[in-house]
Design a protein with these regions (language model features):
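Bacterial N-terminal signal peptides that target proteins for export
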Residues: 2-12
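Solvent-exposed, flexible loop/coil residues
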Residues: 5, 57-58, 119, 123-125
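C-terminal segment of classical bacterial N-terminal signal peptides
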Residues: 17-25
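Secreted/periplasmic proteins that engage bacterial cell-wall peptidoglycan
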Residues: 27-93
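A mature extracytoplasmic/lumenal domain signature
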Residues: 77-79, 91-93, 102-106, 123-125
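Short solvent-exposed strand/turn elements
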Residues: 97-121
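Conserved small/polar residues in nucleotide/adenosyl-binding loops
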Residues: 130
Length: 131
């Protein structure tokens, strides 16, 4: 199977999975958090706050700085985002531009806990500082 075929199949599988998730962002309590959504989309069985995903993945899952469809992008915690954030990589446009599908990032129509599809993310980091 060629790389292009694998990429296409991965994209189709991701699209099929996304189509099964209600875009209103409703889980049992009507509100999506990023962690259960990323786990549902990726199949990666890591639990706990988003800020712990990178360290928990070590030795269990492939990790790196090269984007791949189906991977989970892990954001380090910051002062405003102290639990970190995780997002499902839905498209790779270039080595520094991807699209993610994630939950509980933006306030949409006054509500948090919503799902956003194919949001563009640009890597502006100094490559030397990327793990």
């Amino acid at each position: 199977m060629t790389k292009r075929t694998r990429t296409l199949l991965g994209s189709l599988a991701a699209a099929a999975m996304i189509s099964l998730v209600p875009m209103s962002g409703a889980n049992a309590d009507g509100y999506w958090q990023c962690v259960p959504f990323a786990r549902l989309m990726s199949g990666i069985q890591i639990f706990g706050d988003a800020r712990t995903w990178w360290s928990q993945a070590a030795g269990k899952y492939d990790t790196g700085s090269a984007p791949k469809i189906g991977a989970v992008l892990s954001f380090k915690p910051t002062a405003r985002m102290n639990l970190g954030h995780v997002a499902f990589v839905s498209q790779v446009l270039t080595d520094r531009v991807i699209q993610v599908t994630h939950a509980n990032w933006s306030v949409i129509e006054g509500d948090r806990g919503q799902i956003e599809k194919d949001v563009t993310v640009v890597d502006v980091s100094d490559r030397k500082s990327v793990v």
